[in-house]
C-alpha cells in the first residue's frame, strides 16, 4: 500500500484528488493539510466525503507530512509549492506538484510570467507530467510538474498534427472555454453567481494568460522549433469542463477521414484519449467527472484550415486525474487504476 499526502486539500483540485484516491486500491491517504481549515474534519469542509474520510485537516509542516507519506501531492498556489517541495525531496519523498512551479524548462520563462523562481535546481530536474508525451521519464521521476488544464486540452489536440508536420505552426489559434471551477475556490467578486450566470466572457485577452508559455514550450518541443500561438480563454457558466477549439492552416492532407484515421492511430493504446468519428465533435458533458480527453476534427475547405475540438474535465484530466495517472506511472501501477470511472451524465 502506497502512503500519500495531499497538501493544500481545501480547494477544488484538492477535493477532487481525495475523491479519486479513495477509489484507488493501492493507496492510503495518510495526511491531508489545509492552512485555511486546519483543525476541522475533512467532511466538515467537503460534505461529499462524509463517512469516507474521517481525518482532521492538518497545518502544513513539511517534515511531519514527509514522515507520514511516500508520495506527496502538492495542490498549492504557485510560489507556495516551491517553498515546501525542496524539503520533501531532501527527505527522500517523491512529489507530484499541481501548481505552475515545476512545469517550465527555463526559470527565466517562469520569472517573466510569474515571479523569480526560488528553486531552479529542482526545476531543472522536474519532469513535465503529460503522460502521452513523457511516460518513460515520468516513471523515473522524483518530481513531476502536473500540466495546467488549458495546456492539456490544447497540446493533446495538436500533438498528432505537429508530429506529422501537417500544419503551419505559425498559424495556430486556440480558443478555450472553461467552467468556473477553473478559477479556484477562493471568494472573488467576478466569480459570484450573479456575475457569471447567464453570461459568457473572454479574459486574459491579448496574449497575457499564464498558460501561454506552458503551451508554447511543449508545442515547440513537439514541432522541433519555436512556436508562438494566439490563445484566448473564456469563462462559461458551468461548474467544470474545458472545450478548446483550435485552428491551424493545413500543409498536408485536407481529408477529414484521413485526419481522423491519423489521430486514431496516433493515440491508439492511450487509455484516456478518445478520437471521435468524422462528423462528430466533443462535448464537456461527455467527459464530466472522468479522465478522458475527447477529440474531434473538421476541415474548412474554404480557408484550408483544420479545426480541432478537444474536451476535458478541468478538475480531472486537467488536474487531479492526471496527477493520479502520473502517480500510477511512477509506481508501476496500471495507468488506469483508480481512474476507470465513466463520465457523469446527465
From Swiss-Prot:
Question: Does the keyword Nucleotide-binding belong to this entry?
Answer: no
Q: Which residues form a coiled coil?
A: none
- For the keyword Amino-acid biosynthesis, the answer is yes
Enumerate the InterPro entries for this protein. Answer: AGPR_AS, AGPR_type-1, NAD(P)-bd_dom_sf, NAGSA_dehydrogenase, Semialdehyde_DH_NAD-bd
Q: Which GO terms describe its molecular function?
A: N-acetyl-gamma-glutamyl-phosphate reductase activity; NAD binding; NADP+ binding
Q: Which reaction does it catalyse?
A: N-acetyl-L-glutamate 5-semialdehyde + phosphate + NADP(+) = N-acetyl-L-glutamyl 5-phosphate + NADPH + H(+)
Please state the Enzyme Commission number of this protein.
1.2.1.38
The GO biological-process annotations, alphabetized, read as: L-arginine biosynthetic process
User: Catalytic residues?
Assistant: 149
GO-annotated cellular components? cytoplasm
Pathway(s) it belongs to:
Amino-acid biosynthesis; L-arginine biosynthesis; N(2)-acetyl-L-ornithine from L-glutamate: step 3/4
Q: Where in the cell is it found?
A: Cytoplasm
Alphabetized, the UniProt keywords read:
Amino-acid biosynthesis, Arginine biosynthesis, Cytoplasm, NADP, Oxidoreductase
Protein's job: Catalyzes the NADPH-dependent reduction of N-acetyl-5-glutamyl phosphate to yield N-acetyl-L-glutamate 5-semialdehyde.
HAMAP family for the chain: ArgC_type1
- Which family does this protein fall into? Belongs to the NAGSA dehydrogenase family. Type 1 subfamily.
Q: What is this protein called?
A: N-acetyl-gamma-glutamyl-phosphate reductase
- The organism encoding this protein is Geobacter metallireducens (strain ATCC 53774 / DSM 7210 / GS-15)
Record gene name: argC
Amino acid at each position: 500500500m502506497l502512503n500519500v499526502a495531499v497538501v493544500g486539500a481545501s480547494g477544488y483540485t484538492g477535493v477532487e484528488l481525495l475523491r479519486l484516491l479513495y477509489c484507488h486500491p493501492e493507496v492510503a491517504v495518510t495526511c491531508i493539510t489545509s492552512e485555511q481549515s486546519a483543525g476541522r474534519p475533512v467532511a466538515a469542509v467537503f460534505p461529499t466525503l462524509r463517512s469516507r474520510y474521517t481525518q482532521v485537516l492538518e497545518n502544513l509542516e513539511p517534515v511531519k507530512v514527509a514522515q507520514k507519506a511516500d508520495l506527496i501531492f502538492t495542490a498549492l498556489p504557485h510560489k507556495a509549492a516551491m517553498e515546501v517541495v525542496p524539503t520533501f525531496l531532501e527527505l527522500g519523498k517523491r512529489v507530484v506538484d499541481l501548481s505552475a512551479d515545476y512545469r517550465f524548462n527555463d526559470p527565466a520563462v517562469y520569472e517573466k510570467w510569474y515571479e523569480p523562481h526560488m528553486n531552479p535546481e529542482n526545476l531543472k530536474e522536474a519532469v513535465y507530467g503529460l503522460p502521452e508525451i513523457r511516460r518513460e521519464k515520468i516513471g523515473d521521476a522524483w518530481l513531476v510538474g502536473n500540466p495546467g488544464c488549458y495546456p492539456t486540452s490544447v497540446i493533446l489536440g495538436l500533438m498528432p498534427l505537429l508530429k506529422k508536420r501537417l500544419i503551419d505552426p505559425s498559424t495556430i489559434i486556440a480558443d478555450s472555454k472553461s467552467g468556473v471551477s477553473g478559477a479556484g475556490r477562493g471568494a472573488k467578486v467576478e466569480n459570484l453567481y450573479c456575475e457569471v450566470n447567464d453570461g459568457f466572457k473572454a479574459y486574459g485577452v491579448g496574449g497575457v494568460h499564464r498558460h501561454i508559455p506552458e503551451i508554447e514550450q511543449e508545442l515547440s518541443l513537439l514541432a522541433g522549433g519555436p512556436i508562438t500561438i494566439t490563445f484566448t480563454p473564456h469563462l462559461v457558466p458551468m461548474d467544470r469542463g474545458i472545450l478548446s477549439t483550435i485552428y491551424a492552416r493545413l500543409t498536408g492532407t485536407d481529408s477529414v477521414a484521413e485526419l481522423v484515421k491519423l489521430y486514431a492511430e496516433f493515440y491508439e493504446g492511450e487509455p484516456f484519449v478518445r478520437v471521435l468519428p468524422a462528423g462528430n465533435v466533443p462535448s464537456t458533458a461527455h467527459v464530466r467527472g472522468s479522465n478522458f480527453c475527447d477529440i474531434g476534427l473538421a476541415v474548412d475547405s474554404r480557408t484550408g484550415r483544420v479545426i480541432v475540438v478537444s474536451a476535458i474535465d478541468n478538475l480531472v484530466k486537467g488536474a487531479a486525474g492526471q496527477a493520479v495517472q502520473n502517480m500510477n506511472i511512477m509506481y508501476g501501477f496500471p495507468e488506469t487504476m483508480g481512474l476507470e470511472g465513466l463520465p457523469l451524465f446527465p
